Amino acid sequence: MSPLLTWNLICVSSRWYTILCLKNKVKFWLGTRLVHEPESMESRSSPYIRPSPYAGGVHPHFEEEDDRSKLHASALYSERRTSSRKSLRSQKIDYHTTTIKSLWFDFCARTSSHGIPYVATSSFFGRYVWAALFMCMLMAFLLQTYWTMSEYLQYRTIIEMQLQFEAAAFPAATVCNLNAFKYSELTQYEEIKEGFDYWERVINARMMSDSMKPGGDILEAISVRKKRSKSRDQLLFPIDDEDLEGAVYQPVFVRCTCMNMEQCVPNRNPLEVNASICMCFEDVTRGLIWPCYPTSVWTVKKCSGCSISNTCPDPDGPNASKQIAKHNSPLPCLCQSISHHCMVHPKDEIRWWNPNNYTVYSVTEPPTTEITETEEAFGLSDLKDAGAITTQTKENLIFLVAALPRETRRNLSYTLNEFVLRCSFNSKDCSMERDFKLHVDPEYGNCYTFNFNDSVELKNSRAGPMYGLRLLLNVHQSDYMPTTEAAGVRLVVHEQDQEPFPDTFGYSAPTGFISSFGLKTKELHRLSAPWGNCSDTFRPVPYIYNEHYSPEGCHRNCFQLKVLEICGCGDPRFPLPSEEHRHCNAKSKIDRQCLSNLTSDSGGYHHLHEQCECRQPCHEKVFETAYSASAWPSQNFKIGTDCPAVSDIFNDTEACTEYYRQNTAYIEIYYEQLNFESLKETAGYTLVNLFSDFGGNIGLWIGFSVITFAEFAELFCEICKLMYFKGIVYVQKKMQGKEYTSSSLMHIDFLQRSPKKSQPGEDEVSTNESTKELMSK
């Protein structure tokens, strides 16, 4: 053999050996992969796989026992968890043989949920125990989910507070005089004057009644009344021993108002009807009259010991025996049995008393003492306390003034120049025409709002009283109404786009003081539905306060509409929605009673929650106020030569100072600090918290995830497809059965009607055989 041939044989042998080695390596690699990756073996080598009893189930199967034992662990894993690799999803489903049960067992074998795969086990005990355990955990999960949803649906909120260090916008400030109207202007209207007269009589009667109680001092009570009456030329009474010195008394008839035998007050109008006739003590030297009693309690007696003032002790009084023994010259006298005071009977007839000209009238029959409808409407007859009487009179005054035209009501109160004497903001002068706006309030008359324009934003350059709003206000106390109990001004701090309500939210500042109001601002940010009920655009229709919406105005609007609906008239304390409506009449008993009943039944305009829909604004500013005061003006402070006191005092500094103390109030409104609090309402339990808790609960109790729900959705779709296909197959079979039956019957009918002749009996046999053949098919 040649060397070349030998070399060629060696090369060929080497190549074959190399190929054989590579082939062995491939076989080894395939065997190793078969052991560690049963899925690959399952999908590529069908001889190694034996189908599972359930759809999609696979079992490894090897020829040799040793190989089966080596792959025992992998076979179990493949049977329990990896059967989904060859499930009904990855195969073409045979809807003729597949059932819902097979789909369910396939789902249990491949689902990612915990516990459900054990429900499909072949063990009877394991199957029902795991099913019961899963149902218990499912109930616990549903209960926990109910609690979680309940927490979310409560829509709880939390408040986040943040302090912002920047200058806040200056608010609007509304100032009013505590005396709403000028008394000198009101008395020009007869109805209003009658209201004051009626209040005067009732107050006098109550004070007289209190003084005549055990322990009461009648002189003290009358002294108080006299001091209140002197400045207005009202009815005067003797008040102390000095006034009684030199007095000469005589009896006079007077038309008066009597609450009972002990309470009679002279009427200022002697011609007034519906008044009683009384007899009073009159001091002819001073024109004073006191006390008065009904004529029924006066009797004519013989008195001894009468003084030069024509007063005598009652002979039937407690000290009658001593007086008679001491004086032996009795005179005819008139005595009353209430306080046992007597007067010498005049020689002439007893005359009528008139506070103006003392005209004598003839005695007539006593007119009726019944309370008129007007007096009953005023509501003073049943009141005993002087404060309650005054408060009710103020309300009556609101009703009386509301009946006047709008322009007339403005003229009854104070103008801007009369009320505001000085004004400065941020150490600069104010512009009266530009910075102030008139606001007419039913209770406080003409009020004036500073910084009313919401398009202009005023800010303080610094904190403190020197850089805020400073106002010097003149209240004109000399022209106060008798029902005004305090002298001063009313202040309301509010947002520019809100209606001021001085009767509810205001602060009072007295005269003779510098009243300092330090402000702190809080910005509120509320959440809208479903966490809250706020709205920045909500407006009830109709709305009596125009565009200035606030919850307080909404409640008043609702109450006013309710009054208009039930009573046919509006409450004079609130505006009317249109000119077509009217305010309730102060003298109408029906109107006043209807309004009173509605207020009592509803509990006031803040309690009509069922009939009213009032929402809080989503963004609101709240101003907290700290009050302090100091005396104004100081002794050495130079007010100036422009003193509005009496003109003949010229440059009398003391007189000007006293005038300012009695009639002016200095107001300071400022920020204590140039920062504000921002209170923001946030959701306490959000949708993110809900999903987080829901995921935790479902993972804790039943071991589900979002993927598990997708698997259930897939199972549901497969069942629906199966049911749909089963229905189609059922309908097709039914239709095919009907067609086959009809064709068979037609064939039988054709055979029966065939014209072919046959021997007797042969036709019947052939027909029966054909029918049996068709039926067997």
Curated annotation (Swiss-Prot):
Disulfide bonds: none annotated. The keyword Nucleotide-binding does not apply. Keywords: Glycoprotein, Ion channel, Ion transport, Membrane, Sodium, Sodium channel, Sodium transport, Transmembrane, Transmembrane helix, Transport. It is found in: Membrane. It comes from the Eukaryota. One of its GO terms (biological process) is sodium ion transmembrane transport. Glycans are attached at residues 274, 319, 357, 411, 453, 533, 597. GO terms for cellular component: neuronal cell body; plasma membrane. Residues 752-777 are annotated as: Disordered. PROSITE patterns: ASC (PS01206). Residues 150-689 are extracellular. It is a multi-pass membrane protein. GO terms for molecular function: ligand-gated sodium channel activity; monoatomic cation channel activity. The chain crosses the membrane at residues 129-149, 690-710. Residues 1-128, 711-777 are cytoplasmic. Its main location: membrane. The keyword DNA repair does not apply. Belongs to the amiloride-sensitive sodium channel (TC 1.A.6) family. Sodium permeable non-voltage-sensitive ion channel. Involved in the activity-dependent removal of selected presynaptic proteins, such as synaptobrevin snb-1, and Ras-related rab-3, in the remodeling of GABAergic motor neurons. This is Degenerin unc-8. The gene is unc-8.
